[in-house]
Amino acid sequence: MHAYDAAPGDDGLPAVLWHHGTPNVGAPPEPLADMAVQLGLRWVSYDRPGYGGSTRWPGRRAGSAAVLGERVADALGIGRFAVMGHSGGGAHALACAALLRERVTAAVSVSAPAPYAAEGLDWFTGMYASGAAGFRAALRGRAELERHQAAAAYDPEMFTPEDHAALEGDWSWFGEVVAAAQAGGPGGQIDDDLAYVAPWGGDPAEVTAPVLIMHGDQDRVVPSAHGGWLAGRCPSAELRLLPGDGHISAMRAAPAALEWLAGISRRTAGAEPG
């Protein structure tokens, strides 16, 4: 497994374990790097199995992030840490927080999907057509999803005008991590998509740390109803709906999330788990 550490050996800094989206690699978000330094945060992350330098793990679930995250933290000598993720990474971050309650101090989820079996949520309503088709293929199994992905093409309609502006401007970094992820073939994305329609293996209702859910109200990739459901499921969640934002442009609010997370991380640094 390939891991990242923005401040190797600096055990005095509160750590944030970043969970990347689909298809991405785990490089911590470049647009937030300077702010993380200013806030005194230590970014750590890893490539999920099948991406970048990490070998595949067929059958992994969102909850597998707890196993992987714990390995990274242990290897780096990190005891407690916050988690943060965007898109599918938000689902992995919340599942990690649910399963590692003794270690996770806070969680931030931006534009994340809810579990497929989320009670009372119509999972596909508001989702762009080709994205919904891909997840329906995943529900029919790995072979069907592989056939679908082999024939699929990029659909610019998945993103709003605000998303496209972000991708061409302050969040052009996404192009780099997507290219790095796709260079290794489709395996990581296929395993991710199968995980999103399978049980997470960790219930958001079991998260005990403070949670911040952020979601653009114009999101076509993961409709904002998913964020609302997650906020209602996590016992201590705060929901911030972002007017006019889509799936990518929602990350323009990430600096505020980082400040929120840094404040909690400082208060809990060195505290005994419990």
Model-derived regions: residue spans:
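Gly/Ala-rich beta-loop-alpha elbow adjacent to hydrolase catalytic centers
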Residues: 85-89, 93
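Alpha/beta-hydrolase
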Residues: 127-202
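Flexible "cap/lid" loop of the alpha/beta hydrolase fold
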Residues: 106-140
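Conserved HGGG/HGGXW glycine-rich cap/lid loop of the alpha/beta-hydrolase fold
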Residues: 2-53
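Conserved acidic catalytic loop of the alpha/beta-hydrolase fold
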Residues: 64-81
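Short beta-strand/loop motif that positions the catalytic acidic residue
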Residues: 207, 213-215, 219
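Conserved alpha/beta-hydrolase "acid-adjacent" motif
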Residues: 220-226
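Catalytic active-site module of serine/aspartate enzymes centered on a nucleophile-bearing elbow/loop
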Residues: 237-274
